[in-house]
């Protein structure tokens, strides 16, 4: 019996050594709030996440976990990410798949992203603008249990976090710090994996001082980060600001024209009232004279509005004729 037991033990160990590691992937359907498993294939030594032609079009999320990343690395199996499909997801969870840079999938972050989980990867660099975008959109993001570098490439991130520590320092455990439980006193310490056991504030002060001393060529200062943040914040409001300024200019011009017209009218009226000249009507006035004419039919009308004073024959009415005749009698 002992020999049979030893035989089955060796057989089981041999079989487990030959079993290829599995990559468990699921897609999420929001209509029924359910996750569904699907198989991932290795094609030409490459795994594509999410896989082509395996996820329905109405999927709202993806969750993939690599159970044995060491096997993938030893067998030169690489993982590529399909960012065009990731843009349609609200929930992205890629765990323990050896991701070294968040920018590998940052192009797939759409506006609909509501949850991001990249724990237990090998993230070494995190661009501060990507982290700021995730924070500003209030997206729950889990980046801890990674391997963030203490070197030059993360200096802008340290500057950004130190400046915004009052707001973002509380979120550090959620994003990329790991938690260690000391069983002796049940205390927790948050620190970067490869940057020593320093608390968040002390670590940021140490790292920013280190960056400014060792890498002075990095010209991204705290003030520049803040200015860039404010510029990006109000960048979407520029068209509205331009329209409001244009409307205010038009209204000001209209008021100015109205005020100018009222002043001109008032000035012209006062000037006319002070002058001794009589008001000259627009209709030409005619002076009728009956100079030395016996008959009113030959009366001459003198036009004072013209320089030629050309005579115009005036034909009197019947009543005027009667008045003229009565005067003669």
Swiss-Prot record:
GO aspect biological process, one term: symbiont-mediated suppression of host innate immune response
Entry keyword annotation includes Flavoprotein: no
Keywords of the record: Disulfide bond, Glycoprotein, Host endoplasmic reticulum, Host Golgi apparatus, Host membrane, Host-virus interaction, Inhibition of host innate immune response by virus, Inhibition of host TLR pathway by virus, Late protein, Leucine-rich repeat, Membrane, Signal, Transmembrane, Transmembrane helix, Viral immunoevasion
Cellular localization per UniProt: Host endoplasmic reticulum membrane; Host Golgi apparatus membrane
Record has Mitochondrion as a keyword: no
Signal sequence extent: 1-16
Topological region Cytoplasmic: 261-329
Residues carrying a glycan: 32, 39, 44, 76, 82, 101, 181, 185, 219
UniProt repeat feature LRR, residue ranges: 112-133
UniProt note: domains: Contains putative leucine-rich repeats (LRR) and a C-terminus cysteine-rich capping motif similar to domain structure of host TLR3.
UniProt similarity note: Belongs to the asfivirus I329L family.
Protein name: Transmembrane protein I329L
């Amino acid at each position: 019996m002992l020999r049979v037991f030893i035989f089955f033990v060796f057989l089981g160990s041999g079989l487990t050594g030959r079993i290829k590691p599995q990559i468990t992937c699921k897609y999420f359907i929001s209509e029924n709030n359910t996750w569904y498993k699907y198989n991932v294939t290795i094609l030409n030594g490459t795994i594509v996440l999410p896989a082509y032609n395996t996820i329905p079009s109405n999927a709202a999320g993806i969750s993939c976990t690599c159970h044995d990343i060491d096997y993938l690395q030893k067998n030169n199996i690489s993982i590529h990410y399909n960012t065009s499909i990731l843009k349609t997801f609200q929930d992205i969870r890629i765990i323990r798949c050896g991701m070294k840079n968040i920018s590998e999938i940052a192009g797939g972050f759409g506006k609909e992203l509501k949850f991001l989980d990249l724990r237990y990867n090998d993230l070494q660099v995190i661009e501060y603008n990507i982290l700021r975008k995730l924070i500003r959109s209030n997206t729950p993001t889990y980046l801890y249990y990674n391997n963030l570098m203490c070197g030059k490439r993360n200096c802008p991130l340290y500057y950004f976090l130190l400046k915004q520590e009052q707001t973002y320092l509380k979120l550090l455990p959620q994003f990329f710090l790991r938690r260690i439980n000391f069983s002796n006193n049940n205390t927790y310490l948050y620190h970067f994996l490869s940057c020593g056991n320093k608390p968040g504030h002390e670590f940021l002060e140490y790292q920013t001082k280190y960056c400014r001393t060792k890498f002075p060529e990095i010209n991204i200062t705290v003030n520049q980060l803040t200015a860039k943040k404010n510029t990006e914040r109000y960048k979407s409001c520029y068209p509205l600001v331009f329209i409001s300024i244009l409307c205010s200019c038009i209204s000001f011009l209209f008021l100015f024209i109205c005020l100018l017209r009222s002043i001109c009218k008032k000035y012209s009226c006062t000037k006319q009232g002070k002058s001794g000249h009589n008001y000259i009507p627009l209709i030409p006035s005619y002076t009728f004279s009956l100079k030395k004419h016996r008959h009113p039919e030959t009366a001459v009308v003198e036009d004072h509005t013209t320089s030629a004073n050309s005579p115009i024959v005036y034909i009197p009415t019947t009543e005027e004729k009667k008045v003229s005749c009565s005067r003669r009698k």
